[in-house]
Amino acid sequence: MSSESKLIPIGIISSPYGIRGQVAIKSFTDPASNILNYELKDYRKNIIKIHSAKILSKKIICNIDQIVTRTAAEQLTRTKLYIYKHELPQLPDSEYYVANLNGIKVKNLEGEIIGKINNICNYNAGDIIEVVYNDGKKIMYPFTNEIFPQITEDFVVIVPPEFI
């Protein structure tokens, strides 16, 4: 899959809201309202057209085209919202998108490749990076500057907590 057609998740429909087909969206963008600046798609690349939205506490409450009942809104619960990777704004050299770290090499302080990033999770308390080591062992680490002191587009350097 080329980077032009690669989908990046930037939000999720978390629940129905009210009785008239509105949904609550959890945005992964910063600020959260930036999600409204994109043409959103589901995993099949179907367009999810938002025709009105308001920010309410930590949620974005939206009306989605052709969704007019709570039952229809309930069926969208847990639908991830995507954009194409090329739609993301260009970042300065010292910044990166967390989603772009998936699959890159992990090196130790000596520069040896010891594994790769297998997964990135966020449980609302910060990002967690799952590293799969060359021997197949998987370990999850909090995504902090102490544990990952160097990050490039090709690799990250890890200092596991037992060495800090």
Curated annotation (Swiss-Prot):
Domain of life, source organism: Bacteria
Cytoplasm recorded as keyword: yes
Alphabetic keyword roster: Chaperone, Cytoplasm, Ribosome biogenesis, rRNA processing
GO biological process, alphabetically ordered: ribosomal small subunit biogenesis; rRNA processing
Major site of localization recorded for this protein: cytoplasm
GO molecular function annotation: ribosome binding
Keyword check for Repressor: no
SUPFAM superfamilies xref list: PRC-barrel domain, Translation proteins
Location of this chain's protein in the cell: Cytoplasm
GO cellular component, one term: ribosome
Record domain PRC barrel: where: 93-164
NCBIfam families listed in its UniProt record: 16S_RimM
UniProt remark on domains: The PRC barrel domain binds ribosomal protein uS19.
Function: An accessory protein needed during the final step in the assembly of 30S ribosomal subunit, possibly for assembly of the head region. Essential for efficient processing of 16S rRNA. May be needed both before and after RbfA during the maturation of 16S rRNA. It has affinity for free ribosomal 30S subunits but not for 70S ribosomes.
The protein's name in its UniProt record: Ribosome maturation factor RimM
Native species: Orientia tsutsugamushi (strain Boryong) (Rickettsia tsutsugamushi)
Classification lineage: Bacteria, Pseudomonadati, Pseudomonadota, Alphaproteobacteria, Rickettsiales
